[in-house]
């Protein structure tokens, strides 16, 4: 008889988190609050996209924002100037948020009468894809300067998101970026994904993005 046990810690952690995420989703559903988990690598334009989104939707719905960073309040201070409710989450060195951390943030934010909460996850293409936050939908930003090979290098991230925003299309002429190749690679991983080209800087494509998002929020609240 073996004198030790083998514990599948990673499997156990994921299973526990998945259960907590499902419970959180049920709570948000009852409150009619839509949670968007927005992921990307650092420097992709997440915060600028969040600002554009708030500006476009602030007269249609009440919006809250959870800003996740390892250690900083820069983005939270910027977003707070829009008038949206903001909570800064410091992950203490962790490169992602899980369902428990997200719930803590939502409790701090207060979701009463909040239609949409945007969770700006930690800038990383690996860890955030592995942990269900309890979000209603998952979104990702890929910026043109990052290159068109990211779906090949980080397939899990592209396979779990509902919508992909390809940002910084205003800089397309300056980079060797094959937009059609990205769409083809992504749809092999995730056939139902919505792909929207945008420029958070100029505002191009933002209308299509907010129409998609507002429709998802309404559908979530109507079910």
Question: Where does each model-flagged region fall?
Answer:
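Short acidic active-site motifs
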Residues: 23, 153, 205
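Residues at the C-termini of beta-strands that transition into short coil/loop
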Residues: 90, 142, 199
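Conserved C-terminal guanine-recognition region of P-loop GTPase G domains, centered on the G4
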Residues: 128-135, 144-192
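Canonical P-loop GTPase G-domain recognition
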Residues: 171-223
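Active-site glycine-centered loops adjacent to acidic/histidine catalytic or metal-binding residues
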Residues: 69, 167, 199
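Nucleotide-state-sensitive switch-loop elements of NTP-binding domains
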Residues: 3-26, 31-39, 44, 53-136, ...
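Hydrophobic positions on the alpha1 helix immediately C-terminal to the Walker A/P-loop
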Residues: 49
């Amino acid at each position: 008889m073996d004198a030790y046990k083998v514990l599948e810690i990673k499997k156990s952690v994921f299973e526990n988190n998945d259960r907590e995420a499902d419970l959180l989703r049920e709570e948000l559903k009852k409150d009619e609050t839509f949670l968007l988990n927005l992921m990307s690598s650092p420097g992709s334009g997440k915060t600028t996209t969040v600002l554009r989104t708030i500006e476009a939707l602030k007269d249609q719905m009440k919006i809250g924002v959870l800003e996740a960073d390892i250690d900083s309040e820069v983005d939270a201070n910027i977003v707070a100037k829009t008038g949206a409710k903001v909570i800064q989450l410091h992950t203490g060195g962790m490169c992602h948020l899980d369902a428990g951390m997200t719930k803590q943030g939502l409790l701090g934010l207060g979701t009463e009468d909040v239609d949409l909460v945007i969770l700006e996850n930690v800038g990383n293409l690996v860890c955030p894809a592995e942990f269900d936050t309890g979000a209603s939908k998952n979104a990702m930003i890929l910026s043109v300067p990052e290159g068109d090979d990211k779906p090949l290098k980080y397939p899990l991230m592209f396979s779990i998101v509902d919508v992909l925003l390809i940002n910084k299309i205003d800089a397309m002429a300056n980079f060797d970026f094959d937009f059609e190749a990205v769409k083809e690679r992504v749809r092999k991983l995730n056939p139902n994904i919505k792909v929207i080209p945008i420029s958070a800087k100029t505002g191009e494509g933002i209308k299509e993005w907010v129409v998609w998002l507002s429709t998802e929020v309404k559908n979530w609240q109507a079910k």
